[in-house]
A protein has these predicted regions:
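Structural signature of WD-repeat beta-propeller blades
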Residues: 136, 174-175, 223, 301, ...
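Extracytoplasmic electron-transfer domains, predominantly the class I c-type cytochrome c fold
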Residues: 18, 25-74
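Extracytoplasmic/lumenal domain signature
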Residues: 38, 115-130, 153-173, 179-218, ...
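N-terminal export/targeting leaders of redox proteins
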Residues: 1-7, 60, 71-93, 102
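Short, solvent-exposed loop/turn elements at domain surfaces
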Residues: 102-108, 132-136, 242
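Blade/loop signatures of beta-propeller domains
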Residues: 82-124, 274, 279
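Sequence/structural segment immediately N-terminal to covalent heme-attachment motifs in c-type
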Residues: 3-22
């Protein structure tokens, strides 16, 4: 058949099935993607991770694939019968950002839930999020829950699950919104295309929006906003890691970064690019395609803000092309006022990796010489205190190693390996502390790679002073 006469089923079989039904690649299956709406699937192919794989398809063909995979055009919504008021914001406990504060502790002091009564919890209501995955964590302000998913931010009543208001973005929301009481009755969000929004908290009306620096279509938001009463700190990631599956793609030029934005005006105060501009470093032997480095060092996690030392602190991902950079797989601290690098501590050198390393055919043209092991810092770095009240940064890596560091210079105080590690963790996300212990989730999910440890998935409590379990 000519391409324009192929059915949605044929187009899906020709373009999607080989990878999405291969369980070793860890992609969403066709059945899983069927949980999404047609609009969401189109967005994945036109502006998301699959844009490189779908660029040879016409708009009509993309729509056919989306329509074949999913029958859902849009999700239904139950609207509240009353308006949101300030009194709704004063009841209950708050969780105001991904890290529940600029130190990323992810700890709730004001709760009645404990190990004795958690078994008594019962489902009160449920709310169907768009799509097949939940990319961001909701935040809570009194009786209000703010949940961002795909192209919509929902303001929900915690008693009933109805929506007070919704705000739609032209692009997907992948990360948590943020709120700070001192900044007023406003909520802040950033979408996949790095457009940042300030919204009226009670009505969801737009106050301002700002386009953050986006050097490439591969740059996007993946870590959430960190906030104080005067500024936003926003991480910038890159998904160029998937592009080298194309044998003619010139890998790679993008970099992770951090942006600081004024809360009142939306003005960009500074932007810190992790890597220097990429340079030509050679050509692929098989295809003669050009190779560029340094690249990568994505910031997947939510940055912390240390107001005592005037620092922004965060972790980075792997390099995308060899030779690997000194700033990949590192914990970095920036000056809060200027965005200049204060210190950087790399925990693993020589880690250059992209998705081509996982696909046998693509490995010959797309995989960097160093070939991984892809040990990013995906979990947010935490600022806490030792038993002697000394400040400490706590970090966890996909390698399965946890670290305690000096906030002043990044010196490693202790390190402890709790898991096998892997391309999917290791310590991928989900660390928290009550300033007595560091709680760490360890994945150790199986992949095609072999490691020198047996998998030890689970949740671990570590001594903050020593890192001991």
């Amino acid at each position: 058949f000519p391409e324009d006469e192929l059915t949605g089923k044929q187009l899906t079989e020709n373009n999607c099935v080989a990878c999405h039904e291969d369980k070793s690649i860890n992609l969403a299956s066709i059945d899983t993607m069927a949980l999404g709406t047609q609009r969401e699937l189109v967005a994945v192919m036109t502006e998301g991770k699959m844009q490189e794989q779908a660029k040879h398809l016409s708009k009509a063909e993309i729509n056919k694939i989306a329509t074949y995979i999913s029958s859902a055009e849009h999700a239904l919504l139950l609207k509240c019968s009353r308006q949101l008021t300030e009194s709704d914001l004063r009841s209950g406990s708050n969780w105001t950002s991904k890290g529940n504060g600029p130190l990323n502790k992810r700890y709730q002091k004001n709760t009645n839930i404990n190990s004795s009564n958690i078994k008594n919890l019962k489902l009160k209501w449920s709310f169907r999020l768009k799509g097949w995955d939940a990319r961001s964590q909701p935040i809570a302000i009194g009786n209000l829950i703010l949940a961002a998913t795909k192209d919509t931010l929902y303001a929900l009543d915690s008693d009933t699950g109805c929506a007070f208001w919704t705000f739609k973005s032209p692009s997907a929301f992948r990360v948590s919104p943020a709120y700070d009481k001192e900044a007023g009755l406003f909520v802040f969000a950033v979408d996949q295309e790095l457009i940042t929004y300030k919204l009226d908290l009670l009505e969801g009306k737009l106050v301002w929006k700002t386009q953050l620096p986006r050097e490439s279509e591969w740059n996007l938001s993946s870590g959430s906003i960190s906030i104080t009463n005067s500024h936003l700190i926003i991480p910038i990631s890159t998904v160029e890691t998937i592009a080298p599956l194309n044998p003619m793609y010139e890998c790679c030029t993008t970099s992770g970064g951090i942006a600081k934005v004024d809360i009142q005006t939306g003005e960009l105060i500074w932007y810190h690019r992790i890597e220097k501009p990429a340079e030509l470093v050679g050509k692929v032997r098989v295809t003669r395609t050009k190779k560029y480095a340094p690249s990568g060092s994505a910031v997947w996690n939510t940055p912390g803000i240390d107001l005592t030392r005037n620092l922004v602190f965060f972790g980075t991902g792997q390099s995308l092309q060899s030779p690997a950079s000194e700033f990949s797989d590192a914990i970095i601290a920036l000056d809060l006022n200027t965005g200049e690098r204060v210190w950087s501590t790399q925990t693993l050198a020589g880690d250059a990796y992209n998705v081509a390393c996982e696909v046998p055919m693509a490995r010959q043209w797309g995989c960097p010489v160093e070939n991984g092991p892809d040990f990013d810092f995906g979990a947010s770095v935490i600022k806490s205190f030792t038993s002697n009240k000394e400040e400490i940064f706590l970090a966890g890596q996909k390698s399965g190693w946890a670290f305690g560091m000096k906030p002043s210079n990044g010196e490693i105080i202790w390190k402890n390996r709790i898991g096998m590690g892997g391309v999917l963790g290791g310590i991928h996300t989900g660390m928290a502390t009550d300033d007595e212990r560091l709680y760490v989730s360890n994945s150790d999910r199986a992949s095609l790679r072999k490691y020198d440890w047996d998998p030890k998935p689970g949740v671990y409590a570590l001594n903050i002073d020593t890192g001991e379990i």
